A protein has these predicted regions:
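A short helix->loop->beta-strand "cap" motif at the edges of active sites that frequently abuts
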Residues: 136, 194-196, 265-271
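Positively charged, low-complexity intrinsically disordered leader regions
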Residues: 2-77
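Adenosine-phosphate binding glycine-rich loop
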Residues: 269-322
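Rossmann-like adenosine-cofactor binding region
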Residues: 210-287
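Glycine-rich phosphate/diphosphate-binding loop of Rossmann-like nucleotide-binding domains
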Residues: 65-77, 161-234
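Short, acidic/turn-prone active-site loops that include or flank metal/cofactor-
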Residues: 92-94, 142-147, 203, 222, ...
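Phosphate/diphosphate ligand-binding glycine-rich loop within oxidoreductases
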Residues: 49, 53-160, 280
Length: 322
């Protein structure tokens, strides 16, 4: 397979997945392939290289049934930078509004010649359903509270860039754990790399059941501050809840928000990340979000690199399997 980024090397023989549905099912080797190839793209960006002819003629369609700024734009740019074209599918003006099933919609898009579909949906399992009914690559861009694999990958890539090996490191994931697909993808990926994970938030949003995934849980941010090497600060997802899980935003921020005082009590080299969008003054104060220990904008840049790697790898596996 031709590419004008020789640093990518030969297509990895161990990568055989034409879909990316989540991080739970990946092997450690597959996870490392994704991270290593994403790092190649990120290094190229840092050297001023922005456009490649790696996927000429490839057409990717973004099927988003939930709002998105970063993820949808990032996937579109990723396709374009690989030399592919990207089409944004508008669900509200499509035949879905006339009663067509999502599977029939996907089959019709495939019949028009698309090679990959990037899918976001509020219902867990929709990307998997589509992967069982079409031949093109399906990439999960978030399905309900199940998984958001590319967000998990870019979070982990950012941690690796700052910390090196994650073996033995401790990562705190703080906030709305109950409704977070990001938390789940982080846990699955981090555990495969030997990291320790603590999920933290109000008792209404963090259940002891998380111990079944091999992680620790806590209802006190202050108690874990000096133990963690990384804090991943999640927003509260009010759109997935019918009632507020705590008395007030102010109380939540006082107990679980990261501010300058907590930052000074944490490890001096603590890394702070957040998947975005962030609510300034709730989970993070501007002092923390914009400070030197924050890697939020690095995450955004890494997201583009991750999605380029995912598109390249899944397309390669699709071609090899056909």
């Amino acid at each position: 397979m031709f590419n004008d980024l020789p640093e990518l090397g030969e297509f990895p023989a161990a990568w055989k997945r034409k879909h990316l549905l989540g991080l739970e099912d990946l092997t450690r080797e597959e996870l490392l392939i994704l991270l290593d190839k994403a790092q190649v793209f990120r290094d190229a960006f840092d050297q001023g290289r922005r456009k490649f002819s790696i996927l000429p003629g490839h057409t990717s369609v973004t099927l988003f049934f939930e709002n998105s700024t970063r993820t949808r734009t990032s996937f579109s740019l990723a396709a374009q930078r690989l030399g592919a074209s990207c089409v944004a599918f508008a669900a509200s003006t499509s035949s879905l509004s006339k009663g067509e099933s999502i599977v029939d919609t996907a089959k019709n898009l495939e019949a028009m010649g698309c090679e990959s579909m990037v899918v976001r949906h509020s219902t867990p399992g929709i990307p998997k359903l589509l992967s069982e009914n079409v031949h093109c690559s399906i990439i999960n861009a978030g399905d309900g509270a199940h998984e958001h694999p590319t967000q998990g990958l870019l979070d982990i890539l950012t941690m690796r860039q700052r910390l090196g090996s994650l073996e033995g490191k401790t990562v705190g994931v703080v906030g709305d754990i109950a409704h977070s697909r990001v938390a789940r993808s982080n846990v699955w990926g981090l555990k495969k790399l030997g990291a320790n994970v603590i999920v933290c938030g109000p008792s209404t949003l963090v259940s002891p059941r998380w111990e079944e995934m091999g992680v620790e849980y806590s209802h006190s941010l202050d108690k874990i501050l000096t133990r963690v090497d990384v804090l991943n600060m999640l927003r509260i997802q009010f759109e997935r809840q019918y009632t507020s899980p705590f008395p007030s935003i102010r109380e939540y921020s006082l107990l679980f928000g990261m501010d300058g005082d907590r930052l000074r009590r944490a490890k001096p080299d603590l890394l702070v990340i957040a998947p975005g969008p962030i609510n300034r003054g709730v989970e993070l104060t501007p002092e923390v979000a914009d400070g030197p220990q924050s890697a939020i904008l690095d995450q955004v840049s890494n997201g583009l690199a991750v999605r380029m790697a995912v598109l390249w790898l899944t397309d390669g596996a699709r071609k090899l399997s056909s």
